[in-house]
Amino acid sequence: MAVEALSSAPRVKVAPWNDPVIRGWVFQIVVVGAVGFLAWYLVSNTVENLARQKIASGFHYLEREAGFEIGDTMVAYSPASTYARAIYVGLLNTLKVSVLGVFLATILGTMIGVGRLSPNWLLAKICAWYVEAFRNVPLLLWLFLFYKLISEAFPGPRQAIGAFWNSVYLSNRGLYFPVPLADPIHKWMGIALLLGIAGAWALQRWARQRQDATGQPFPAISAGFGLALGLPLLVWLSGGAPHHLSWPELKGFNFEGGTVIQPEFTALLAGLVLYTSAFIAEIVRSGILALHKGQSEAAMALGLSRGQAMRLVLLPQALRVIVPPMTSQYLNIVKNSSLAIAIGYPDLVASINVTINQTGQAIENILLIMAAYLSVSLSISAFMNWYNKRIALRER
């Protein structure tokens, strides 16, 4: 009876401004409207000011001739190429130094991090001094130092240091060495290399499953390297083993022919790797220390050596702690590569900086830089998040 009385009681009407649902919708509409108005005002005001100053807008300039040289290119480029091509070349240079930096910094940082935990007092102290020295000095200063050392320590092209029967030359202009001339077989060698890498990955998975099932190890690393390198070698031999090379030769004041690793690239890569590896070393060390001490004791009790315990027991478990903060370091390598402009390496920022100076269209070019770095960073984050989920513990 009391329930019927409660259900039949008239509902109290609430004013619209006191209804939290209606109030929430109103606030959201007001905020979205204010943001939209602000965006419209900024865009319209910018377009009007650009028109008043007779500065073109839009991305049509990308189809015009660039008219400037780029010293280090991975693809064909000349001053007659378009601005779009020049920006593409700069992006490839950024990706090249970033990928190599991530790979080398991971290896070096892992070695330094493990070295800090070594029972060898001298090795542990050297690794600790390395970490403290590199991570407490700004990266830009390291880049200046490495570039100055490379440009001042080595002789000029006429006094270049020759090696390997004068086929390789080292000077303050870079490291010159011979490269194979273009041949159709190289395309098939590249395909064979990709197939070999895929086969090595499948072999590694099979070896791991076999060891889990039988306890018998399989030399998957050496076999994988043999497969990845053996397939391209077989393709090269089956294609007649073409060995025509372009050799570096001193002509005038510099070398021509072959290829060169420029000092700007070397200084940038060395700075990124040594600086970032100091942070990665601390991440690796903290990840290993986060494990229970009983893990290492159990590994030793099974008869494993210290190296085997680290490789087979400790590091695989520490990955769950190491991977999340490593994402930030990989992103830092990509973003810090923009400091290349300080030592003259033609990366994405340098190419777009020249484009801005010649076209005057700063807004569009800055948007291109932001879009490029955002795309690369999101791709790295997505991959690392996927890998982190893959190695996470799964509860039953």
What are these regions (language model features)?
Residues 2-396:
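Transmembrane alpha-helices and adjacent helix-loop boundaries
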